[in-house]
Amino acid sequence: MVGREDEMEKLLDLLIEGDPRLATISIVGEEGLGKTTLAAEAYNSVYVKNYFDCRAWVHVSSKSTEEELLDAIRKSVVQFAETIGSIYEHLTGRKFLIVFDNASETYLPGKVKGAFPDDVNGSRLLLTTTAKWMAHEAQPSLPLALSALNIEQSWEMLVNMVFEQNNCPVELKDLGISLVKKCHGFPLAILLLGSLLSKKGKKKLCVVKSGNISSRI
């Protein structure tokens, strides 16, 4: 991930290294900073796939109930399971990773933590959230806080999206940097900007007006 190499390395270390007891890791930050993308990159990495025996990804909506969350976990980790005990039984003896994406409205993951055995084998729960209090409540020592990208990282991300072989024509660089500054380091905004510019094509970028683009970010 452009601009998130250090965070990715730290996240993989938290997932794979350290205390073998069951731990809850939180990726914390404002909306649009790339929490879900970072979690997904780690979740789908070769290291994580090889390390964990069982993985599951659960999206937590603002309307999720405890029962719905358990049902989503059941469908992800074991077919035909009907009780919280079934999840526990299925995961016992396995090294597992369960991701709770967008756990920002209520601390439901904490309410269902009893569904997961702690076999002291390196299993992990991973939350993405905008709520700092939730990360503290889950496990104060293991939050990974995301901040906005700096201008160099933002520009690199945009160039990778828009230009072939990551080669921006010199005459377009100043305009491109002025546009990317309007994204304030938020990867989601840069992604939208890159999508808009890619559709226009690099030959048309020179006639793009900053005001027109910024109004759509």
Language model features with spans:
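N-terminal flanking helix/linker immediately upstream of nucleotide/cofactor-binding cores
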Residues: 1-33, 37-46, 50, 61, ...
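Surface-exposed loops and adjacent edge beta-strands of modular extracellular domains
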Residues: 17-19, 48, 105, 187, ...
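Intrinsically disordered, low-complexity regions enriched in proline, serine, glycine
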Residues: 23-24, 37, 50-52, 67-70, ...
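Short, acidic/turn-prone active-site loops that include or flank metal/cofactor-
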Residues: 26, 30, 62-63, 130-132, ...
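A short hydrophobic beta-strand->loop->alpha-helix junction that borders the nucleotide-binding pocket
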Residues: 55-64
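Non-catalytic, charged helical/coil tracts that couple and regulate nucleotide-powered enzyme cores
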Residues: 73-81, 85, 121-123, 131-217
